[in-house]
Amino acid sequence: MKFFIEKNKKNTDRVTINIPKKIVSNELIREFIEINKKTKINGFRKGKTPIKIIQEKYGNRVYYDVFNQLMQKFFYEFIKKEKIKIIGLPKYVMHENEDQKEYFKYSVNYEVYPKFEIKDVNLIKVEKIIVNIKDEDVKKNIEKTASYEKDIWNKVNRAIKTNDLVTINYCIYENNKKLDKFNVEKFKFIVSQNNFIPELNNKLINHFTNDVIFFKINFCKFHPEEELQGKDITFKIKILNVEEKQENIEIEKNIKTIKINKLSKLNYQTIKNNIIEKIKSLTQNHLQNQIIKQLIIKNPINIPPTLLREETNFLRNKFIKEYKEKQENILKKKYHTNLESKAKTRLHIKLIIEKIIRDNKISVNEEKVDLLIKKISLKYKKPLEIINIYKKNTMLRKTIKNIELEMQVMQFLIKKVKIIEKNWTLDEIMNYNWKNNEELFA
């Protein structure tokens, strides 16, 4: 068997394979003999029909089946020999073979996993946040929490500002046609302190109660509402109510004092531990995100189209399921995301992680997997039941194994990169806008 490979920069390669005619002829004859054994044709005893007649009657079907089998057989022999890892299904193309005396020629187009080397890890510089938590910081945090729990809102007759609580009705139109199923009444939220599209927040500012406002947006083609995907939709909003938060210093002071006194006697240490755990998680994610973002920049990869399609479909199905289960609002910002771009980033990270695991022979530590499961179980009322579920369910355990592997990869990278420590206060870390730091390592 002879083959010729044509390389393509975009992960789609083409191989041309020559199968000796003798192999094809022998396979055809063998197939015709098998058919003859099982077939009875008028005028001939079973198994005694001349091969030429069998060939005339069943030839086209047999040629098609035999060529298909041989094309697949020799292609998979080729990728096994060359140690090629393909993505998706290959596409076979037959050549005109009239002039070929010795070979039948065909080509196969196939996608391959991208080949790349992880570069410049030691040149990566990242910032590690260090927070020294003092008792007075914890008390301050408790005071803030106490005041949040007793927010009092009062109706106002003025222009809407950031952080006001508004109540609205809205309906939507496509080409001046009202889409009644999306009507929403008495929809309440705090301006600029929500997860809705910026157009909504921006339009409300400086408007008054009873104002009617309009804005138009183009819905993302990946939005869970199929009826709205890729369409220009006009929103009509009626402002029903505007409220501002009451700042009563005396009331807040009393509430804080009561809260702190109670907490100091009951579970002050628990609250402190929770704050420490939260900060540990925030700073760790911040560190990981910096490393991953720089790895992506320093190691560009051509993402194969098949992988991108599969990952985009996975994210789309996940979004649709979540949207329906939670009965989410069409204005939620996360559903106006370009899933293809998100899928590309996720695949980029996944390929880098897999490469680091392979190159450095990182393997699962079963003891650490068990410890992770135990840690997860402690968040539930019946930890032992949760541990048993993970023991019995191989898919769940595999998920934890992947998390443990990713943690090892991050530890490996943290040792390689240059870390610059930076001290933050508890206030700084609590007031930082962490929403802008997308969790990439997931």
Curated annotation (Swiss-Prot):
MF term (GO), any: peptidyl-prolyl cis-trans isomerase activity
Name of the top EC class for this enzyme: isomerase
Catalytic activity: [protein]-peptidylproline (omega=180) = [protein]-peptidylproline (omega=0)
Source organism, top-level taxon: Bacteria
Gene Ontology biological process: cell division; protein folding; protein transport
Chief site of localization: cytoplasm
EC number assigned by the record: 5.2.1.8
Domain PPIase FKBP-type as annotated: residue spans: 163-248
SUPFAM superfamilies noted in UniProt: FKBP-like, Triger factor/SurA peptide-binding domain-like, Trigger factor ribosome-binding domain
Disulphide-bonded residues: none
InterPro entries per UniProt: PPIase_dom_sf, Trig_fac, Trigger_fac_C, Trigger_fac_C_sf, Trigger_fac_ribosome-bd_bac, Trigger_fac_ribosome-bd_sf, Trigger_fact/SurA_dom_sf
Gene Ontology cellular component list: cytoplasm
NCBIfam families: tig
Domain notes: Consists of 3 domains; the N-terminus binds the ribosome, the middle domain has PPIase activity, while the C-terminus has intrinsic chaperone activity on its own.
Family per record: Belongs to the FKBP-type PPIase family. Tig subfamily.
Task of the protein: Involved in protein export. Acts as a chaperone by maintaining the newly synthesized protein in an open conformation. Functions as a peptidyl-prolyl cis-trans isomerase.
Protein name per UniProt: Trigger factor
Gene: tig
